[in-house]
Amino acid sequence: FTGLRIGLAAVKGLAFAANTPCAGVSTMAALAYGVCGEGTVIGAQDARRGQVYWAGFDLATHARLTPDAAEPVTALEAFVKECKKPLIFVGDGAALCYNTYKDQPGILPCPQPLRVLRGAGVALAGKAMWDAGTCVSPAELLPDYHRLSQAERERAEREAAQQSATN
């Protein structure tokens, strides 16, 4: 959370000074753009507690097939069964997903060097956003966390407990 905020502040400052629009590239899109071929790619980052941040993309066109989400790894089952094959998983959650679904038909292991987030994937996803005219002003560039930070979750739990105690 903090690293993302610091990175966004740096990008926004540079873009504002240069009067340049920003491409808000999701991590899942950057992972997907780092590989090519036929079939489907799922960008998956380990969100801990048996969950992954994930999104599905067409491997040939990199067209987004699902929104970014934070869900239990088992929640991908319907998408995994129905998507175009072959299917590969990339990101630091790739092994978790692959081990969960490797017995499904059409699931392929991804070579380790292609599983990591690479600058080329970020650049290609950003260029696609530029070409599509979906870049935004620095003021409009905002983080998308997909879930509350641990500190925010703990505060909400304390507030709920206090609310229950006063009722």
Task: Mark where each language-model region is.
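DPxDG-like acidic metal-binding loop motif
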Residues: 1-20
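Acyltransferase
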Residues: 110-167
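Short, glycine/acidic-enriched capping/hinge loops at junctions between secondary-structure elements
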Residues: 3-5, 99-101, 157
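Surface "functional belts" at beta-alpha junctions
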Residues: 20-117, 131, 145, 150-151
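Buried hydrophobic packing segments
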Residues: 10-14, 31-32, 122, 126
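General helical structural elements
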Residues: 9, 16, 52-53, 151, ...
